[in-house]
């Protein structure tokens, strides 16, 4: 009977497999409880993309990009878990990020479902940037020729072409090739009529709390999730989540 709002990389639960998904749904039905996953990415950025789509008469493609120099995120385990530090040519590297971040695929599936798209497949692609010299980040070392940046893309495809793309571009420092430019935030682009571009980023990149930015979309969703029907719910099934009761009127 306990409603759950989580930022633990959970959107639809499909990554857990059919058997575990059925267990969750059955438990939710018995307890009349709901479970919802949110955060920034996956999370609020996909809601922004869906809301932006309402301004279009025709949509050819929606792209969501997270692009950042993540050197300040001092978690060697996280980076090593998605392939950083391995040789660029390591045949096992491409599958690491896909296995470690299944909720990004779930987010694409959620958007496709919300837009009523008959998706044929969700494709995963990745490319790497190699360190141009030995790099010591303080919390991990990356040897020359090893992975120091990656670009991933999960794309929902209809009639053989990508109609929704979720892209990630992460790098650790600037001693890498290719040295991709980054946006230091999130960018939503819609190709269509009209074509749109939305940028969501901290005004002062070095002075914000990423944990707070991740938590608040979940906190603001609590009331809506408690009122939702039992089971796994996604953003398109809830009312618009806003920052109610947060405006400083003093």
Predicted segments, located by residue:
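Rossmann-fold NAD(P)-binding glycine/threonine-rich loop
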Residues: 3, 8-34
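Structural motif
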Residues: 7, 36-38, 65
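Gly/Ser/Thr-rich loops at beta-strand to alpha-helix junctions
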Residues: 11-17, 40-45, 69
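Conserved active-site and cofactor/substrate-binding residues in soluble primary-metabolism enzymes
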Residues: 19, 23, 43-44, 98-106, ...
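Alpha-helical support elements that line or immediately flank enzyme active sites
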Residues: 43-55
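Active-site-lining helix/loop region of Rossmann-like oxidoreductase modules
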Residues: 54-188, 202, 208
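C-terminal helical cap and adjacent loop that interface with cofactors, partners, or active-site loops
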Residues: 175-250
């Amino acid at each position: 009977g306990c409603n759950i709002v989580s930022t633990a990389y959970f959107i639809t639960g499909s990554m857990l497999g059919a058997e575990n998904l059925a267990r969750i749904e059955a438990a939710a039905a018995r307890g009349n409880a709901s479970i919802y996953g949110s955060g920034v990415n996956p999370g609020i950025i996909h809601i922004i993309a869906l809301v932006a789509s309402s301004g279009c008469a025709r949509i050819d493609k929606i792209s969501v990009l997270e692009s950042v120099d993540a050197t300040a995120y001092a978690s060697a385990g996280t980076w090593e878990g998605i392939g950083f530090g391995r040789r660029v040519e390591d045949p096992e590297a491409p599958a690491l990020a896909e296995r470690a971040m299944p909720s990004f695929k779930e987010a694409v599936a959620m958007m496709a479902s919300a837009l009523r798209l008959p998706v044929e497949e969700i494709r995963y692609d990745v490319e790497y940037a190699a360190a141009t010299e030995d790099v010591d980040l303080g919390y991990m070392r990356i040897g020359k020729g090893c992975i120091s940046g990656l670009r991933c893309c999960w794309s929902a495809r209809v009639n053989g072409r990508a109609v929704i793309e979720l892209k990630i571009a992460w790098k650790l420092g600037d001693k890498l090739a290719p040295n991709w430019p980054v946006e230091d935030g999130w960018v939503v682009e819609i190709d269509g009529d009209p074509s749109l571009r939305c940028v969501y980023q901290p005004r002062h990149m070095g002075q914000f709390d990423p944990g707070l930015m991740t938590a608040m979309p979940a906190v603001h969703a609590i009331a809506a999730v408690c009122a939702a029907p039992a089971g796994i719910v996604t953003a398109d099934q809830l009312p618009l989540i806003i920052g109610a009761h947060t405006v400083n009127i003093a």
